[in-house]
Amino acid sequence: MVTKKQSRVPGRPRRFAPEQAISAAKVLFHQKGFDAVSVAEVTDYLGINPPSLYAAFGSKAGLFSRVLNEYVGTEAIPLADILRDDRPVGECLVEVLKEAARRYSQNGGCAGCMVLEGIHSHDPQARDIAVQYYHAAETTIYDYIARRHPQRAQCVTDFMSTVMSGLSAKAREGHSIEQLCATAAMAGEAIKTILEE
């Protein structure tokens, strides 16, 4: 008995949609981190071949850059909305930390902050991309504090960065939203004391 090998029906090749690839890759990079994800894993996950990836994004780091851009645009803490000049500085900074705790807590298998985790990448290009976003957020926080507390701006910004990095790390370790919010609240009290508000 001879069995016929089923051949694929000819037709148009599957279309590659870069925007859908970015959204899908965002989950992968967020769950595992840039360094832990191989090009083969990315292409398999996206259902494309390596040449398609390179044609669309140039490299894995190029894809990561686009992913971070989308992440910052859709999932980052809305600093511009929270850091308001009509409210006490300490109160707004506490809200930033609480929002970080909420956003960094486990969400569909993606915990922590992709930017904060990205700055630890061993790949120089990926790390530089993440550092740009990190510095932009730090500068926004620093400038906000400096408008009313110029002499405390650097130390409070450093403290905020340290606490947010810790919240991200603890979220990735599996800390609950309640634990993260409690830490954010304690850190917020310290900030209010430092600013004497």
Swiss-Prot record:
InterPro entries: DNA-bd_HTH_TetR-type_CS, Homeodomain-like_sf, HTH_TetR, Tet_transcr_reg_TetR-rel_C_sf
Record flagged with keyword DNA-binding: yes
SUPFAM superfamilies noted in UniProt: Homeodomain-like (SSF46689), Tetracyclin repressor-like, C-terminal domain (SSF48498)
Pfam family membership, one: TetR_N
One of the protein's GO biological processes: negative regulation of DNA-templated transcription
Domain HTH tetR-type: 15-75
DNA-binding region: 38-57
Keywords, comma-separated and alphabetical: DNA-binding, Repressor, Transcription, Transcription regulation
Molecular functions per Gene Ontology: DNA-binding transcription factor activity; transcription cis-regulatory region binding
Its job: Negatively regulates expression of bdcA.
Protein name (database record): HTH-type transcriptional repressor BdcR
Lineage: Bacteria, Pseudomonadati, Pseudomonadota, Gammaproteobacteria, Enterobacterales
Gene name as annotated: bdcR
